[in-house]
Structure formats: structure tokens, C-alpha cells
Amino acid sequence: MARVVRPQKNHVDLDIYQSSYMVDYKPFGKYKYSRVTPQEQAKLDAQLQSKEFYQPKPNPNPKLEEGYPAFRRPYMTALDLGVPGFFPPQERVTTRKDDGRFTTTCHYAYPASLALYLAQQDPYWLHQRADFPCLMEPERQPAPEVGKGYLLLPGCLCDHHQRVKVPILNRWGPLMPFYQ
């Protein structure tokens, strides 16, 4: 009987079991069974507050992923990639005739003639596609080192280009697929 533990001699230190559902725990009675000093308790409270009850504030200057030379400034646009031919020019170029706009090989985005286009399609879509080139054509594709790591989605509805993927750009850099 020499090794019997008497409950009135050894009190249970409930503070070591304290967790988020016991934040408002107060020891009952006039005896506090804690061996934690006030400095340690303040440190533990700060850790608990930072882990479970802290609302993260968004950084006004988000850091971009390293390794991309165009991502040095905090506010980057997709035009900073600077691949020639990947983005349409910003300034308006006057053309001699409307038929001159349809010069590419993708018949979905640019048919052979404007009259055939207006006969087959809604004229509203002409203004949406006239200044944006078909990204499926080889000369419109980005360089392999630039297109690396982007979320690749089909960019053209024609059957010839359904298997090819193009990068969809995000403001803060490439959108990685959820499985990477």
C-alpha cells in the first residue's frame, strides 16, 4: 500500500487540458491547481488567440510567385508577360475594309469573308471576336517557358482546335490546377 496515490494529496492540473472549448474556464474554489506562471499563461493565451480566434488581414501588397521575371512589381497585369502576338494591340489600327480583318486560319473566330460571317452568325459576336486573335494558331501560342505552369483550358470551339489548350491568365500570375 506504499504506492497508493491519494486523490486529496495530488490535485489534477486542469490547466494542462485547456483547449478552445475551455477558454472561459475558471478553477473552482479558493485553490488554484495550476503550476503555470502568469508570463507563461500570457504566452499561451497569445498562442491560442493567434491560432483559433485570429482573423487574417489581407496583405495590401501581395507577394507573387518567384521565378517569373514579369512578376517583380506588386501590381501586375497580364500584359506584363510581353509575349508578342499573344495579346491584341491596345491601339486601334485602321483597316482598308472589313474583309481585311479575317486573315487568320481559324474559321470559327475569323471566317473567310465578312458577308459569310454576317449571314451565319449574330452580328453582336463580330465585335467581341474582331480584336481578339484565335489563340489556337501556332503563331499566337505563348513561348513554352511563359506558358509553363498556367491553368490550361480549351480556348476555341472549332473541332480542329479542341485538343489544344491555351493559358488562361490571372491578375496575380498563373492559376495552378487544384490537383498540382
UniProtKB/Swiss-Prot annotation:
It is found in: Nucleus; Cytoplasm; Cytoplasm, Cytoskeleton, Flagellum axoneme. GO terms for biological process: flagellated sperm motility. The keyword Nucleus applies. It holds the Pfam family TSC21. Keywords: Cell projection, Cilium, Cytoplasm, Cytoskeleton, Flagellum, Nucleus. Only detected after the mouse is 35 days old. Expression increases gradually from day 35 to 6 months, and remains stable after 54 days. Exclusively expressed in the epididymis and testis. InterPro entries: SPMIP9. Disruption phenotype: Deficeint mice are fertile and have no detectable defects in the testis/body weight ratio, epididymal sperm count, and testicular and epididymal histology. GO terms for cellular component: axonemal A tubule inner sheath; cytoplasm; nucleus; sperm flagellum. It comes from the Eukaryota. The keyword Cell membrane does not apply. Disulfide bonds: none annotated. PANTHER family: TESTIS-EXPRESSED SEQUENCE 37 PROTEIN (PTHR36882:SF1). Microtubule inner protein (MIP) part of the dynein-decorated doublet microtubules (DMTs) in flagella axoneme. This is Protein SPMIP9.
